[in-house]
Amino acid sequence: DLKKCKQGKDFGRGFYLTSSYEQAKNFVPLSVKKQVNIGSMVEGTTEGVISVFRLHLTSDVNVYTFDSADAAWLHFVTANRRKDLFPNLASQYQKYDIIAGKIANDRTARTLQIYISGGYGEPGSDEADRIAIETLLPNRLENQFCFCNQKAIQTLEFVRGDRCELGSF
């Protein structure tokens, strides 16, 4: 049920995946911690699961890909994280079932917060965009895929769940 997915994520509400197994593995401890905090998992949980999927795209699925962490990507991520910045931008992407691009992770969160709060200048200005992007690029940004609706979810085939010990990180 996509309505249970949290709002305010990089590409909006949806089911998120990555093609990087290592990135998924590194996300497990944070994911488990969040689930413990909301009561979905018990305190003291010692392992998590990496879910592996196969994608079966069909021609009727609309996919948009941000090829790089550029101004368009930055503005879209910002619009999803703070609705009053670039207020009409998020709606321009509603026609897409899957949105792909770089991930703004915990290493980049501070840069995005500074950008959003105007620390680099007015968000959307050439100068603020340039500084934010130059600051983000050295972080070796991985990819992410947001499956925005049920049509997109139906392109996924669950392959397996790999258990991983939380202490093995």
Ranges and model annotations:
Residues 5, 9-10, 25-26, 30-169:
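Conserved NAD+-utilizing ADP-ribose enzyme module
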Residues 10-16:
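A short, exposed loop/beta-hairpin motif centered on an aromatic-Gly-Thr core
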